[in-house]
């Protein structure tokens, strides 16, 4: 009996659309998925092709005769350096943004692998959870719009402490009032 071993597609290409078909949110959707993964409890693992936003390698499938080769591209060093140096390249955009997310994670005590985590219930298209450092001195609310429409978010809905100033660790945006309602762009993570 045949059983599927794996999905034969690169993760980057798998996230280039929804059930409605391909769309223009591919890079944003891909980075959103990684931002959520990097903020979750535990020790994250990142496949090199996710770090680089590697697309399906159809030529490798054809040459090897193995479908699983589709997500096992072998980069030529000079070609990779060239792609990463072009700001408009999806590879460059993904690499820079995931590096930023890794740095944010590294700097925050609440992202310790064993730090507390609780899921927030904020609606169907908003994925959220709360992380708290092991010494309980830092709280981080990770909020991601996992849909392709902008969504309002009332800061009061995530139980922010009213006397604290809150900062989006990715954008640097400050929020001074828990009464604020902010708009989260499609696939944006705060």
Regions found by a protein language model. Name each.
Residues 1-140, 144-151:
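Loop/helix patches that line or flank the sugar-binding groove of alpha-linked glycan CAZymes
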Residues 134, 170-171, 185:
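Short, ordered coil/turn segments that flank beta-strands lining enzyme active or ligand-binding pockets
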Residues 136-138, 173-177:
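Short, surface-exposed beta-strand/loop "edge" segments at domain boundaries and coil↔beta transitions
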Residues 149-171:
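Beta-strand-rich binding/interaction modules
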Residues 176-190:
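C-terminal beta-strand-rich structural cap/linker in extracellular carbohydrate-active enzymes
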């Amino acid at each position: 009996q045949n059983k599927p071993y794996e999905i034969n597609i690169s993760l980057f290409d798998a996230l280039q659309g929804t059930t409605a078909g391909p769309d223009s949110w591919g890079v944003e959707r891909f980075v959103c998925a990684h931002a959520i993964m990097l903020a979750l409890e535990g020790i994250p693992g990142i496949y090199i092709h996710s770090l680089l936003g590697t697309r399906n390698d159809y030529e490798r499938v054809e040459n090897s005769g193995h479908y699983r080769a589709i997500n096992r591209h072998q980069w030529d060093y000079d070609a990779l350096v060239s792609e990463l140096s072009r700001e408009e390249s999806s590879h460059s955009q993904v690499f820079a943004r995931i590096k930023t997310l890794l740095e944010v994670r590294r700097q925050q005590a609440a992202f310790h692998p064993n730090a507390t985590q609780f899921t927030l219930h904020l609606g169907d298209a908003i994925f959220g959870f709360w992380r708290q450092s092991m010494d309980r001195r830092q709280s981080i609310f990770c909020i991601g719009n996992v849909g392709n429409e902008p969504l309002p978010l009332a800061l009061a809905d995530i139980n922010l402490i009213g006397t604290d100033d809150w900062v989006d660790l990715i954008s640097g945006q400050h929020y001074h009032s828990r009464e604020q309602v902010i708009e989260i762009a499609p696939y944006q993570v705060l």
